[in-house]
Amino acid sequence: MTKLSRRQVAGGILAGSTALAMPSLAFGALPRVVVVGGGAGGATAARYIAKDSKGAVDVTLVEASKRYYTCFYSNLYLGGFRNYGSIGHNYYGLATNRGVNVVHEWATSVDAGKKVVNLGHGGQVSYDKLVLSPGISLKYDSIP
């Protein structure tokens, strides 16, 4: 009979609990991270999760728009020093350089119990970890 130390038992419990926390790991699949929102916060989160994991995490970015127009440098556009297109960015670099799966669709709801993001066309994207970065929404009618 093989003797196990307390440290080995604790390590086994930790490994087993990791599989429970991220069910895809129990079946040998990569852990899945879904980022909702492709603005400055969401795109940056997706980029660095993919970059820092070195391919060990399956990263999906859900963003309805094909281009993001940044607030950064917008004053240069407003001042006439840059054209409007220069402050727009697509998601091609995230997909090709970082391996991020980009889904151009509205995220309509999240089912935290099932760990899925429901999409506007009726599809779903499952996740182990979720990052919500939907940006802001202004209520123009609330300004007197």
Predicted segments with their positions:
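A short, basic/flexible loop-to-alpha-helix module at the beginning of a structural domain
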Residues: 16-29
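A conserved short coil-to-beta-strand element within the FAD-binding core of flavoproteins
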Residues: 105-114
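Glycine-rich beta-alpha-beta "Rossmann" dinucleotide-binding loop(s) and their flanking helix/strand
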Residues: 138-144
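N-terminal secretory signal peptides and thylakoid transit peptides that target proteins
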Residues: 1-17
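Glycine-/small-residue-rich beta->alpha transition segments that form the dinucleotide
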Residues: 129, 133-138
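Beta1-alpha1 glycine-rich phosphate/pyrophosphate-binding loop at the start
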Residues: 27-101
